[in-house]
Amino acid sequence: MQKLAEAIAAAVQAGQDKDWGKMGTSIVGIVENGISVLGKIFGF
């Protein structure tokens, strides 16, 4: 869950800095970590 929060924070910071490349990779990290969290919850 901590990695998900870190990915969200990185995406927000990248948006504020207008670093679109980093923002894109941060969004991928959010999706990746979100799927991992859901997998743990539902036992995938």
From Swiss-Prot:
InterPro entries: PSMbeta. It is found in: Secreted. It holds the Pfam family PSMbeta. GO terms for cellular component: extracellular region. GO terms for molecular function: toxin activity. GO terms for biological process: defense response to bacterium; killing of cells of another organism. The keyword Secreted applies. Keywords: Antibiotic, Antimicrobial, Cytolysis, Hemolysis, Secreted, Toxin, Virulence. Signal peptide: none annotated. Has hemolytic activity and also inhibits the growth of gonococci. Belongs to the staphylococcal hemolytic protein family. This is Antibacterial protein 1 homolog. It comes from Staphylococcus haemolyticus (strain JCSC1435).
